[in-house]
């Protein structure tokens, strides 16, 4: 049975807006507890691979306290994200 992917738009504490598959993971207090898979920064209506200048990783761990809010992507953003990640 395939696990359902949870795709969300995240507003981070540094004001970046990122669309990503997100999963909460068990972690020790203070350790990163959210796994972002294939994160893309939304900038000017376009998607850019998040942290592309710094890494080739497709998975990034962050602390949930760095997420101000998360929402379901609009159909347009979801379609763009699906195209760039498939």
Per-segment meaning from a language model:
Residues 2-86:
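Conserved RNA-binding domains used in RNP assembly and mRNA/RNA metabolism
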């Amino acid at each position: 049975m395939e696990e359902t992917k949870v795709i969300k738009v995240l507003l981070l504490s540094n004001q970046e807006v990122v669309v990503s598959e997100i999963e909460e993971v068990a972690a020790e207090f203070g350790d990163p507890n959210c796994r972002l898979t294939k994160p893309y920064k939304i900038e000017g209506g376009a998607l850019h691979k998040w942290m592309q200048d710094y890494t080739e990783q497709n998975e990034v761990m962050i602390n949930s306290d760095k997420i101000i809010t998360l929402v379901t992507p609009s159909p347009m953003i979801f379609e763009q994200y699906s195209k760039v990640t498939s």
